[in-house]
């Protein structure tokens, strides 16, 4: 493309190349819209077709996964690994198992991951992978056979200095263990090619908690910069999985009253707030094969909003921790009308572009996922460092490093987030992540 093209011309170019990839196009639009004024002031970043290269993955691997279920029936799923950018290190990003997974979603996640990893200051590139396999309702044997079948193809594309996956939606410690075990068997190599592993074979303390903890660390820093804090605040959390659980735990430690959590079936509301005992029971219920938030609500006699998200509940802080585009304009209007002060993304792109703009116009503090939920991948980077050194750090050391990284990310967002009274964290995160990746790409030439 001509180096003088406009923002809309560039976005139309991306849309035209992949007309059916709506999630990816949305992610590119969100990033480029905030970057464009910076790019016009810094024309060197429009040279050498850098932007065109930045929105095109270095490699996309697609393959079938054939496995046998408990009824002895052959099942066929589709899987991908999007190796988006290795400009600053090996590809790094999770594997997602969910029926909704497609190439558009994985490209959007890999694109976001590239900037998120750059923000951590650790030497990690961006990638993402997954399958349309649904682990819900499957036996442990079926999940194991699927993971092992998937690795018979994926293993040849991974390596400690090439591509290091981790978990994501539908992929927890169990699934990572199955995949890492099969990788070791096929490659005859025990090098670190997965993070989020069990502690018995190279995992890191604090890794399961890291995304949720990091979200709260970042949000607390954002609140403090604007004269507030979690202490005494009413908080709602969407989701009830790994990220949500540990965000609830850390928010309680900071003095917040967490009054809502959810899953795909509905929302539980507890005006008295979660306690350690209640949270432990929720985690226990959700870890069972078919455990639902409704079961938790019934057991404790709490309000249950069937089929609803938590955004109608009046709160000071909202933490969307479920999935992409869960918080739309209508939900944003509800939150704003109820006096929400801050929204911080625990999931990847859970807020639509229109809702994000609405929050910013209303003066609501808004922390984008690429900054606020970077704690998980940051601790994955720390796990890689421990594996490379053949060491295991104490929980306190990992947690302290995580906290320090999240404060550094917050500082980078503030540095690039404008000079007004209220920091534009979307702009700050996008520019800070972009500059690191773009500088590396320019230094390495046209490759």
Q: Language-model features: where?
A:
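Predominant activation on well-ordered alpha-helical scaffold segments within soluble catalytic domains
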Residues: 11-12, 29, 33, 103, ...
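Glycine-rich phosphate/diphosphate-binding loop of Rossmann-like nucleotide-binding domains
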Residues: 195-198, 203-314
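Rossmann-like adenosine-cofactor binding region
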Residues: 266-366, 371
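General beta-strand structural signal in soluble alpha/beta enzymes
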Residues: 162-166, 190-194, 237, 260-263, ...
């Amino acid at each position: 493309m001509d180096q003088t093209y406009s923002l809309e011309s560039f976005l139309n170019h991306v849309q035209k190349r992949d007309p059916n990839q709506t999630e990816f196009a949305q992610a590119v639009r969100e990033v480029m819209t905030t970057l464009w004024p910076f790019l016009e002031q810094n024309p060197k970043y429009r040279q050498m077709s850098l932007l065109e290269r930045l929105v095109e993955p270095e490699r996309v691997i697609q393959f079938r996964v054939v496995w046998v279920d408990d009824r002895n029936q052959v099942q066929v799923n589709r899987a991908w690994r999007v190796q988006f950018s290795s400009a600053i290190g090996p590809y790094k990003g999770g594997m997602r198992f969910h029926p909704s997974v497609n190439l558009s979603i994985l490209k959007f996640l890999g694109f976001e991951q590239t900037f998120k990893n750059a923000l951590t200051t650790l030497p990690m590139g961006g990638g993402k992978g997954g399958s349309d396999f649904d682990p819900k309702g499957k036996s442990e044997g079926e999940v194991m056979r699927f993971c092992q079948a998937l690795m018979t193809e994926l293993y040849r594309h991974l390596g400690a200095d090439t591509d290091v996956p981790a978990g994501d939606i539908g992929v927890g410690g169990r699934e990572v263990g199955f995949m890492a075990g099969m990788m070791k068997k096929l490659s005859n190599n025990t090098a670190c090619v997965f993070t989020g592993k069990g502690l018995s074979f190279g995992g890191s303390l604090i890794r399961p908690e890291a995304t949720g903890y990091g979200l709260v660390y970042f949000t607390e820093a954002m609140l403090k910069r604007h004269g507030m804090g979690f202490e005494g605040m009413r908080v709602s959390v969407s989701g009830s999985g790994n990220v949500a659980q540990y965000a609830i735990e850390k928010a309680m430690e900071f003095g917040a009253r967490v009054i809502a959590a959810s899953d795909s079936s509905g929302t539980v509301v507890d005006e008295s707030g979660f306690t350690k005992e209640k949270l432990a029971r929720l985690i226990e219920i959700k870890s069972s094969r078919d455990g639902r938030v409704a079961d938790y609500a019934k057991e404790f006699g709490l309000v249950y909003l069937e089929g609803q998200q938590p955004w109608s509940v009046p709160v000071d802080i909202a933490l969307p921790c479920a999935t992409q585009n869960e918080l739309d304009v209508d939900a944003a209007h509800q939150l704003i009308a109820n006096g929400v002060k801050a929204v911080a993304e625990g999931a990847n792109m859970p807020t639509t572009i229109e809702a994000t703009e609405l929050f910013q116009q209303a003066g609501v503090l808004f922390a984008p996922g690429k900054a606020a939920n970077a704690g998980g991948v940051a601790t994955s980077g720390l796990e890689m460092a421990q594996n490379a050194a053949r060491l295991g750090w104490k929980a306190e050391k990992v947690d302290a490093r995580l906290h320090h990284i999240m404060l550094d990310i917050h500082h980078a967002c503030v540095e690039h987030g404008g000079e007004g009274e209220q920091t534009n964290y979307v702009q700050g995160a996008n520019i800070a992540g972009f500059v690191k990746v773009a500088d590396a790409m320019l230094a390495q030439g046209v490759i």
